[in-house]
Amino acid sequence: MTNETTLETVGKTLLRFVLLLTALTAFAGPSRAQLEGIIDIHAHSDPDMQPRRYDALEFAKRAKAQGMRGAVLKSHEVPTAQLAYMINQLVPGFQSWGTLVLNRSVGGINPRAVEIQAMVKGSYLKLVFMPTKDAENAQAHAEKRQYVPVSKNGVLLPETIEVMKLIIKYNLVLATGHVQPSDALLLTSEAHRMGIKSVVVTHPTLQHTTVAQMQEEARNGAYLEFTANPIIPAGQHGSPTIIPNLPSRKPEEWAADIRAIGAEHIIMSGDFGGPNYPDFVPGWKMYIAALKGAGITDAEIHMMSCDNPAHLLGMDAPASGK
């Protein structure tokens, strides 16, 4: 081996070491700058029916300490407006919102459940999800159970329309849940026709939605939620009974989707909290680092993680491009 070859090998080894050290420092370091101003619209915590890494109080305290602005508390089974009320009392300066997911545990597509939760003291119900684990799309891959339909023969059901009317009445956000892409398109199209102001398509790539379909949903005025899980390293995914056949994506593919749709139509979210996911602090840092490594700019990340969720939730957006 020549001296030139030896020097080249040593140089490459040192470069790999520096890159690894930089990544580890970014994920483990105490700096809160990367999470400053983030609003996570998809945060799982206890109390819940599934195992979680932390409870909502611990999550909110730690998120506030990291500089995060707020979060939507998500449970597939249990309404969380009451939980959000208590967290807002206990952790001032960090805004929490509740959700209602229209799975079988609340009677499926149940307008009365929506109205009751919307009237809970504090009015902290914000996102109303169409079915997730009880959606037809999920049941096709999981154990065979009764599913909760939102449409029939390409037409939204009357009770689905009634829920959408209540979303307008109480100034809520429509989230599409784990429904199949064709139903998500029906929902966003009808929401646009009805004048629903705030709509988010729940992690569409996990439902195998095409870029063309996402572009159409964006034209209907909906935000597209890009959760971290498809580009978090393998072996850190959640239960396959919740999201069947979870597709992984390379950061470069994710970046290409963002470019094709436009960052102004996308919301980055965590979907952390499950025991098989990373903790939300290093998880968010890994997510941001992966997108930046694929060419997404700081300004675009700020737009997708801070400004767009603030707009979805009816908050005054902070200044862009921090």
PLM regions: where:
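Mid-to-C-terminal alpha-helical segments outside catalytic/metal-binding sites
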Residues: V281-K322
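Divalent metal-dependent hydrolysis catalytic cores, especially in the metallo-beta-lactamase
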Residues: D40, H44, E58-T80, F94-R104, ...
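Active-site beta-loop-alpha junctions enriched in small/polar residues
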Residues: H44-D46, H76, T99-S105, P131-A135, ...
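Histidine/acidic residue-rich metal-binding segments in metalloenzymes
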Residues: A56-K61, A81-M86, P92, P111-L127, ...
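Bacterial N-terminal signal peptides
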Residues: L14-A26
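Short acidic/histidine-rich active-site segments
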Residues: T227, I261-F280
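N-terminal secretory signal peptides that target proteins for export/translocation
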Residues: M1-T13
